[in-house]
Amino acid sequence: MTRKLVLLRHGQSQWNLDNRFTGWVDVDLTEQGRQEAAAAGKLMKDEGLQFDVAYTSVLKRAIHTLQGALKELDQDWLPVHKSWRLNERHYGGLQGLDKAETAAKHGEEQVKIWRRSYDIPPPAMDVTDPGHPGHDRRYATLDRNALPGTESLATTLVRVLPYWHDAIAPQLKAGQTVLVTAHGNSLRALYKYLNDISNAQILELNIPTGIPLLFELDDNLRVQSYRYLGDPEAAKRAAEAVANQGKAK
């Protein structure tokens, strides 16, 4: 039996538009982002996808993307589970900074390493910083010292995988069709795990906003196929635009 999983990166956020490092900062969608969410829902509807359960992060840009997509699908009633483990990678001291200005200051290669390498985190945010998640009450039940002040993709994967194994994978194994609406790097982490690609290969992977990525999995959740819904060239262009965000102007 083929299991279906869709990974959907949130639509354009205000800080995507402003070309700023966002991380765990709770920035909302732009009007374009809301349109992308609806368009993603239409693509999934045209594909004939009937979901059984959905998962998202605790950040509004992902939550609102999921809501917009489900409305277009006419599946607003779907059970939705939110977890901080699906949050974007924490960008530490880079959060809020302009990506192009940071590239001009530190060099495009260094910014590419911070953005796209597997195991090198950006400079950390101190736990005493008001922007640290330890001061945000949505994480009040968690150990403040266990919350990240920065993350690499490797540590993001370590954070995401327990939720995959404990919450998402059992639903897929039970034959459920699953939608995960999250963020560029939490989804890159899942992509790496599912496709078992190398640390070097993940450096070149960019996930565009608002375009559903459909996986077909076997009974053991091994990948049989995967593809972006809609126009493949449009998805390619959107991914290239993501890659160019870290370049100096």
Swiss-Prot record:
User: Could you mention a single GO BP entry for this protein?
Assistant: glycolytic process
**What SUPFAM superfamilies does this protein map onto?**
Phosphoglycerate mutase-like (SSF53254)
- Kindly state which keywords UniProt assigns to this record, in alphabetical order: Gluconeogenesis, Glycolysis, Isomerase
> Which of this chain's residues are annotated to bind substrate?
9-16, 22-23, 61, 88-91, 99, 115-116, 184-185
UniProt pathway: Carbohydrate degradation; glycolysis; pyruvate from D-glyceraldehyde 3-phosphate: step 3/5
The protein's annotated catalytic reaction(s) are: (2R)-2-phosphoglycerate = (2R)-3-phosphoglycerate
SMART domains, alphabetized: PGAM
InterPro entries referenced in this protein's UniProt entry, alphabetically: His_Pase_superF_clade-1, His_PPase_superfam, PG/BPGM_mutase_AS, Phosphogly_mut1
Catalytic center residues:
10 (tele-phosphohistidine intermediate), 88 (proton donor/acceptor)
**Molecular function (GO) terms listed?**
phosphoglycerate mutase activity
What EC number(s) does this enzyme carry? 5.4.2.11
> What residues correspond to the site Transition state stabilizer?
183
Source organism, top-level taxon: Bacteria
Broad class of enzyme this protein falls into: isomerase
User: One Pfam family name from the record?
Assistant: His_Phos_1
Quaternary structure annotation from Swiss-Prot or TrEMBL: Homodimer.
HAMAP family given in the database record: PGAM_GpmA
Q: What does the record give as the function of this protein? A: Catalyzes the interconversion of 2-phosphoglycerate and 3-phosphoglycerate.
Name used for this protein in its record: 2,3-bisphosphoglycerate-dependent phosphoglycerate mutase
Species for this entry: Xanthomonas campestris pv. campestris (strain B100)
Gene designation per UniProt: gpmA
